[in-house]
Protein backbone atom coordinates (compact mmCIF):
# COMPACT_ATOMS: atom_id res chain seq x y z
CA UNK A 1 0.00 0.00 0.00
CA UNK A 2 2.82 2.38 0.91
CA UNK A 3 4.47 1.70 -2.43
CA UNK A 4 1.21 2.35 -4.30
CA UNK A 5 0.67 5.55 -2.33
CA UNK A 6 4.17 6.76 -3.14
CA UNK A 7 3.58 6.04 -6.81
CA UNK A 8 0.31 7.99 -6.80
CA UNK A 9 1.95 10.96 -5.06
CA UNK A 10 4.72 10.96 -7.65
CA UNK A 11 2.21 10.88 -10.50
CA UNK A 12 0.17 13.76 -9.05
CA UNK A 13 3.32 15.79 -8.45
CA UNK A 14 4.52 15.15 -11.98
CA UNK A 15 1.16 16.18 -13.43
CA UNK A 16 1.20 19.39 -11.41
CA UNK A 17 4.63 20.24 -12.75
CA UNK A 18 3.47 19.57 -16.29
CA UNK A 19 0.43 21.83 -15.93
CA UNK A 20 2.42 24.61 -14.28
CA UNK A 21 4.87 24.54 -17.17
CA UNK A 22 2.14 24.57 -19.79
CA UNK A 23 0.36 27.74 -18.63
CA UNK A 24 3.29 30.17 -19.02
CA UNK A 25 4.06 28.67 -22.43
CA UNK A 26 0.54 29.46 -23.68
CA UNK A 27 0.76 33.02 -22.37
CA UNK A 28 4.19 33.48 -23.89
CA UNK A 29 3.05 32.27 -27.31
CA UNK A 30 0.03 34.60 -27.35
CA UNK A 31 1.97 37.65 -26.16
CA UNK A 32 -0.98 39.69 -24.83
CA UNK A 33 -0.28 42.73 -22.67
CA UNK A 34 -1.35 42.81 -19.03
CA UNK A 35 -5.12 42.76 -18.52
CA UNK A 36 -5.88 41.06 -21.85
CA UNK A 37 -7.00 37.51 -22.50
CA UNK A 38 -5.53 35.17 -25.09
CA UNK A 39 -8.45 33.57 -26.96
CA UNK A 40 -8.58 29.98 -28.17
CA UNK A 41 -7.61 31.34 -31.62
CA UNK A 42 -4.53 33.17 -30.33
CA UNK A 43 -5.85 36.75 -30.36
CA UNK A 44 -5.81 39.32 -27.56
CA UNK A 45 -8.90 41.08 -26.21
CA UNK A 46 -11.18 41.70 -23.24
CA UNK A 47 -14.63 40.53 -24.37
CA UNK A 48 -16.30 37.15 -23.95
CA UNK A 49 -14.86 35.89 -27.24
CA UNK A 50 -11.38 36.26 -25.75
CA UNK A 51 -11.89 35.72 -22.01
CA UNK A 52 -14.69 33.14 -22.17
CA UNK A 53 -14.66 29.55 -23.38
CA UNK A 54 -11.26 28.41 -24.66
CA UNK A 55 -9.36 31.34 -23.10
CA UNK A 56 -5.68 30.32 -22.90
CA UNK A 57 -4.22 32.93 -20.58
CA UNK A 58 -4.78 36.29 -18.91
CA UNK A 59 -7.79 37.25 -16.75
CA UNK A 60 -10.02 34.53 -18.25
CA UNK A 61 -13.65 34.56 -17.10
CA UNK A 62 -14.27 31.82 -14.61
CA UNK A 63 -10.62 31.82 -13.51
CA UNK A 64 -11.87 32.97 -10.11
CA UNK A 65 -10.68 35.47 -7.56
CA UNK A 66 -9.47 38.93 -8.39
CA UNK A 67 -9.20 38.38 -12.16
CA UNK A 68 -12.81 37.27 -12.51
CA UNK A 69 -14.03 40.12 -10.33
CA UNK A 70 -12.07 42.62 -12.39
CA UNK A 71 -13.48 41.28 -15.63
CA UNK A 72 -17.00 41.39 -14.22
CA UNK A 73 -16.42 45.05 -13.44
CA UNK A 74 -15.37 45.72 -17.03
CA UNK A 75 -18.44 43.85 -18.32
CA UNK A 76 -20.63 46.14 -16.26
CA UNK A 77 -18.90 49.24 -17.63
CA UNK A 78 -16.78 49.98 -14.56
CA UNK A 79 -13.12 50.91 -14.55
CA UNK A 80 -11.02 53.55 -16.26
CA UNK A 81 -11.96 55.53 -19.33
CA UNK A 82 -14.95 57.56 -20.39
CA UNK A 83 -18.43 56.76 -21.61
CA UNK A 84 -18.02 56.26 -25.35
CA UNK A 85 -21.60 57.39 -25.85
CA UNK A 86 -20.94 60.71 -24.11
CA UNK A 87 -17.93 61.44 -26.33
CA UNK A 88 -19.29 60.24 -29.66
CA UNK A 89 -22.28 62.54 -29.68
CA UNK A 90 -24.79 62.84 -32.51
CA UNK A 91 -23.23 66.20 -33.39
CA UNK A 92 -19.72 64.73 -33.58
CA UNK A 93 -20.72 61.67 -35.61
CA UNK A 94 -22.92 63.58 -38.04
CA UNK A 95 -20.31 66.31 -38.27
CA UNK A 96 -18.07 63.77 -40.00
CA UNK A 97 -20.75 62.15 -42.13
CA UNK A 98 -22.28 65.43 -43.29
CA UNK A 99 -19.05 66.33 -45.07
CA UNK A 100 -19.64 63.48 -47.53
CA UNK A 101 -21.56 64.20 -50.77
CA UNK A 102 -25.28 63.46 -50.71
CA UNK A 103 -25.01 60.62 -53.21
CA UNK A 104 -22.67 58.54 -51.03
CA UNK A 105 -23.90 55.06 -50.14
CA UNK A 106 -22.29 55.27 -46.71
CA UNK A 107 -24.21 58.36 -45.72
CA UNK A 108 -27.37 56.37 -45.06
CA UNK A 109 -25.50 53.22 -44.00
CA UNK A 110 -23.26 54.37 -41.16
CA UNK A 111 -25.15 55.57 -38.08
CA UNK A 112 -24.13 56.60 -34.60
CA UNK A 113 -26.45 53.98 -33.12
CA UNK A 114 -24.87 51.17 -35.13
CA UNK A 115 -21.45 52.28 -33.87
CA UNK A 116 -22.65 52.38 -30.25
CA UNK A 117 -24.28 48.95 -30.63
CA UNK A 118 -21.00 47.57 -31.92
CA UNK A 119 -18.91 49.29 -29.24
CA UNK A 120 -20.86 47.51 -26.49
CA UNK A 121 -19.29 44.25 -27.66
CA UNK A 122 -15.77 45.64 -27.15
CA UNK A 123 -15.68 46.92 -23.60
CA UNK A 124 -11.91 47.43 -23.72
CA UNK A 125 -12.22 50.10 -26.40
CA UNK A 126 -11.28 53.49 -24.92
CA UNK A 127 -11.75 52.05 -21.44
CA UNK A 128 -8.49 50.98 -19.86
CA UNK A 129 -6.47 54.16 -19.21
CA UNK A 130 -7.16 57.81 -18.28
CA UNK A 131 -10.11 59.85 -19.52
CA UNK A 132 -7.84 61.86 -21.84
CA UNK A 133 -6.28 58.65 -23.19
CA UNK A 134 -9.76 57.31 -23.86
CA UNK A 135 -10.73 60.43 -25.78
CA UNK A 136 -7.51 60.22 -27.78
CA UNK A 137 -8.30 56.62 -28.71
CA UNK A 138 -11.79 57.57 -29.90
CA UNK A 139 -10.30 60.47 -31.87
CA UNK A 140 -7.74 58.12 -33.43
CA UNK A 141 -10.36 55.54 -34.38
CA UNK A 142 -12.58 58.09 -36.12
CA UNK A 143 -9.60 59.79 -37.77
CA UNK A 144 -8.81 56.52 -39.52
CA UNK A 145 -12.49 55.86 -40.27
CA UNK A 146 -12.76 59.32 -41.84
CA UNK A 147 -9.71 58.74 -44.01
CA UNK A 148 -10.57 55.18 -45.02
CA UNK A 149 -14.18 55.96 -45.99
CA UNK A 150 -13.99 59.57 -47.19
CA UNK A 151 -16.04 60.97 -44.30
CA UNK A 152 -18.18 57.81 -44.23
CA UNK A 153 -18.97 58.05 -47.92
CA UNK A 154 -17.72 54.62 -48.99
CA UNK A 155 -18.82 51.22 -47.76
CA UNK A 156 -16.82 49.19 -50.28
CA UNK A 157 -13.28 49.81 -51.45
CA UNK A 158 -13.11 51.71 -54.75
CA UNK A 159 -12.43 49.15 -57.49
CA UNK A 160 -12.08 46.57 -54.75
CA UNK A 161 -13.79 43.84 -56.76
CA UNK A 162 -10.87 44.00 -59.20
CA UNK A 163 -8.29 43.47 -56.46
CA UNK A 164 -6.96 40.15 -55.20
CA UNK A 165 -6.94 39.98 -51.41
CA UNK A 166 -6.64 36.21 -51.11
CA UNK A 167 -3.65 34.84 -49.24
CA UNK A 168 -3.62 31.30 -50.60
CA UNK A 169 -0.85 30.29 -48.21
CA UNK A 170 -3.17 30.80 -45.22
CA UNK A 171 -4.69 27.38 -44.59
CA UNK A 172 -6.46 28.32 -41.35
CA UNK A 173 -8.71 30.83 -43.13
CA UNK A 174 -8.93 29.54 -46.73
CA UNK A 175 -10.46 31.69 -49.46
CA UNK A 176 -13.81 30.48 -50.71
CA UNK A 177 -14.67 30.13 -54.42
CA UNK A 178 -16.12 33.27 -55.94
CA UNK A 179 -15.67 35.37 -52.79
CA UNK A 180 -13.75 38.64 -52.66
CA UNK A 181 -12.03 39.95 -49.56
CA UNK A 182 -11.52 43.59 -50.55
CA UNK A 183 -11.96 46.49 -48.16
CA UNK A 184 -15.39 46.92 -46.60
CA UNK A 185 -16.72 48.92 -43.67
CA UNK A 186 -15.39 51.77 -41.51
CA UNK A 187 -11.78 50.56 -41.52
CA UNK A 188 -12.02 48.75 -44.86
CA UNK A 189 -11.20 45.31 -43.46
CA UNK A 190 -9.54 43.20 -46.14
CA UNK A 191 -7.86 39.80 -46.73
CA UNK A 192 -9.19 36.36 -45.92
CA UNK A 193 -7.04 36.12 -42.78
CA UNK A 194 -8.99 39.07 -41.35
CA UNK A 195 -12.48 38.21 -42.60
CA UNK A 196 -12.24 34.67 -41.20
CA UNK A 197 -11.39 35.41 -37.55
CA UNK A 198 -13.47 38.61 -37.51
CA UNK A 199 -16.53 36.64 -38.55
CA UNK A 200 -15.73 33.93 -36.00
CA UNK A 201 -15.55 36.53 -33.25
CA UNK A 202 -18.63 38.49 -34.29
CA UNK A 203 -20.89 35.61 -35.28
CA UNK A 204 -21.06 35.42 -39.07
CA UNK A 205 -19.20 33.45 -41.74
CA UNK A 206 -16.67 36.00 -42.90
CA UNK A 207 -15.14 33.70 -45.49
CA UNK A 208 -18.36 32.56 -47.16
CA UNK A 209 -20.29 35.79 -46.67
CA UNK A 210 -17.86 38.74 -46.68
CA UNK A 211 -20.57 40.96 -48.18
CA UNK A 212 -22.28 40.91 -44.77
CA UNK A 213 -19.85 43.64 -43.73
CA UNK A 214 -21.35 45.92 -46.38
CA UNK A 215 -24.95 44.97 -45.60
CA UNK A 216 -25.30 45.24 -41.81
CA UNK A 217 -24.02 48.52 -40.30
CA UNK A 218 -23.59 47.09 -36.80
CA UNK A 219 -21.57 44.13 -38.09
CA UNK A 220 -19.63 46.59 -40.22
CA UNK A 221 -18.60 48.62 -37.16
CA UNK A 222 -17.92 45.41 -35.24
CA UNK A 223 -15.37 44.33 -37.86
CA UNK A 224 -13.67 47.71 -37.53
CA UNK A 225 -13.57 47.45 -33.74
CA UNK A 226 -12.43 43.82 -33.94
CA UNK A 227 -9.51 44.88 -36.13
CA UNK A 228 -8.79 47.86 -33.89
CA UNK A 229 -8.73 45.87 -30.65
CA UNK A 230 -6.50 43.17 -32.13
CA UNK A 231 -4.07 45.33 -34.09
CA UNK A 232 -4.20 48.96 -33.00
CA UNK A 233 -5.48 49.38 -29.44
CA UNK A 234 -2.29 48.06 -27.87
CA UNK A 235 -0.07 50.67 -29.59
CA UNK A 236 -2.13 53.75 -28.65
CA UNK A 237 0.31 54.50 -25.83
CA UNK A 238 3.04 54.94 -28.47
CA UNK A 239 1.26 57.85 -30.15
CA UNK A 240 -0.96 58.30 -33.18
CA UNK A 241 1.90 57.56 -35.57
CA UNK A 242 2.02 54.00 -34.28
CA UNK A 243 -1.65 53.54 -35.17
CA UNK A 244 -0.97 54.61 -38.76
CA UNK A 245 1.82 52.06 -38.94
CA UNK A 246 -0.48 49.36 -37.55
CA UNK A 247 -3.22 50.07 -40.09
CA UNK A 248 -1.38 50.89 -43.31
CA UNK A 249 2.28 51.33 -42.46
CA UNK A 250 3.62 49.28 -45.37
CA UNK A 251 2.01 51.64 -47.89
CA UNK A 252 2.20 55.00 -46.11
CA UNK A 253 4.96 55.19 -43.48
CA UNK A 254 8.66 56.03 -43.93
CA UNK A 255 7.91 58.57 -46.65
CA UNK A 256 5.89 56.23 -48.88
CA UNK A 257 2.72 58.36 -48.84
CA UNK A 258 3.17 61.53 -46.77
CA UNK A 259 -0.08 62.99 -48.09
CA UNK A 260 -2.12 60.14 -46.60
CA UNK A 261 -0.21 60.35 -43.31
CA UNK A 262 -0.77 64.10 -43.08
CA UNK A 263 -4.49 63.67 -43.78
CA UNK A 264 -4.86 61.10 -41.00
CA UNK A 265 -2.92 63.29 -38.56
CA UNK A 266 -5.01 66.37 -39.39
CA UNK A 267 -8.25 64.48 -38.77
CA UNK A 268 -6.87 63.18 -35.48
CA UNK A 269 -5.77 66.63 -34.30
CA UNK A 270 -9.16 68.09 -35.23
CA UNK A 271 -11.05 65.43 -33.27
CA UNK A 272 -8.75 65.80 -30.27
CA UNK A 273 -9.48 69.53 -30.36
CA UNK A 274 -13.21 68.82 -30.42
CA UNK A 275 -12.81 66.51 -27.41
CA UNK A 276 -10.70 69.06 -25.51
CA UNK A 277 -7.52 66.95 -25.25
CA UNK A 278 -4.00 67.35 -26.57
CA UNK A 279 -3.04 64.98 -29.40
CA UNK A 280 0.17 63.93 -27.66
CA UNK A 281 3.47 63.20 -29.39
CA UNK A 282 4.72 60.85 -32.09
CA UNK A 283 1.97 61.79 -34.51
CA UNK A 284 3.71 60.68 -37.71
CA UNK A 285 5.28 57.46 -38.90
Swiss-Prot record:
Annotated S-S bridges: 30-38, 32-44, 37-51, 55-60, 104-153, 166-175, 253-285
Q: Where in this chain does the record put each Chitin-binding type-1 domain?
A: 28-62
Q: Per the UniProt entry, what are the Gene Ontology biological process annotations, in alphabetical order?
A: cell wall macromolecule catabolic process; chitin catabolic process; defense response; polysaccharide catabolic process
UniProt signal peptide: 1-27
Q: Which UniProt keywords apply?
A: Carbohydrate metabolism, Chitin degradation, Chitin-binding, Disulfide bond, Glycosidase, Hydrolase, Plant defense, Polysaccharide degradation, Signal
Q: Per its UniProt record, what CDD domains does this chain match?
A: chitinase_GH19, ChtBD1
The record's account of tissue expression is: Expressed at low levels in leaves, sheaths and meristems.
Listed EC numbers: 3.2.1.14
Gene Ontology MF, one: chitin binding
- The superkingdom listed in its UniProt entry is Eukaryota
Reaction it catalyzes:
Random endo-hydrolysis of N-acetyl-beta-D-glucosaminide (1->4)-beta-linkages in chitin and chitodextrins
Name the residues that span the membrane: none
Catalytic positions are 148
Q: What does this protein do?
A: Hydrolyzes chitin and may function in reproductive organs during embryogenesis and seed maturation.
Q: Which family does it belong to?
A: Belongs to the glycosyl hydrolase 19 family. Chitinase class IV subfamily.
Q: What is this protein called?
A: Chitinase 4
